[in-house]
Amino acid sequence: MKMFIGELVALSMMAFALGMDAFSVALGMGLFRLQLKQIFYIGIMIGLFHIIMPFLGMFLGRFLSYQFGSIASYIGGALLLLLGIQMIVTSFKKESDRFVSPMGIGLIFFAFSVSLDSFSVGLSLGIYGVRILLTILLFGFFSTVLTWMGLMLGRHFQQWLGAYSEALGGSILLAFGLKLLFSF
């Protein structure tokens, strides 16, 4: 039970870190005064992609772990480390350089692009051997809720919090990557 709680806390922190990416972009979208129905659909779509993408990543990660053993764990840690660095660097780009319209095919493209990092994390976690169902449900839940929060708070806080929220998420992934690399 104690081990499950530890895994739950670690996975929740990771899900929060990934959700911060969606949150930071949603803050920018919140400036467009979206209707509540649109906000609901955007959050659901991003949540679904944050379930599908890490699931695919974990499936591939488990395969690699089975084939390559302990070397795969180092690869997983390195991927998390690189992803964390990439999120921190991206957080300092202009918000206008990253914006995609959140309607129709633009919403699907947006949800896919925001969830690409969760594929990489899923790959790392698949190598590490975490519980798949728990992981994808946490990733979906956190990304959906954080997207909704970002959209709702966007009009008020986007200018001072936008870049920092993604940098925080990147820092958390960076820390988990370092933990995986140096725990063997």
UniProtKB/Swiss-Prot annotation:
As for membrane topology, the entry says:
Multi-pass membrane protein
Q: By its UniProt entry, which InterPro entries does this protein fall under?
A: Mntp/YtaF, Put_MntP
Q: Does the keyword Transmembrane apply?
A: yes
Q: Which residues cross the membrane?
A: 8-28, 39-59, 68-88, 103-123, 132-152, 162-182
Does the keyword Transmembrane helix belong to this entry? yes
Location in or out of the cell = Cell membrane
Q: Which GO terms describe its cellular component?
A: plasma membrane
| Keyword field | Cell membrane, Ion transport, Manganese, Membrane, Transmembrane, Transmembrane helix, Transport
Q: Which cysteines are joined by disulfide bonds?
A: none
Query: Which domain of life does this protein belong to?
Result: Bacteria
Q: What GO terms are given for molecular function?
A: manganese ion transmembrane transporter activity
> Of which family is this protein a member?
Belongs to the MntP (TC 9.B.29) family.
Mind telling me which HAMAP family this protein's record contains? MntP_pump
User: What is this protein's function per UniProt?
Assistant: Probably functions as a manganese efflux pump.
Instruction: Provide the protein name.
Output: Putative manganese efflux pump MntP
Source species taxonomy:
Bacteria, Bacillati, Bacillota, Bacilli, Bacillales
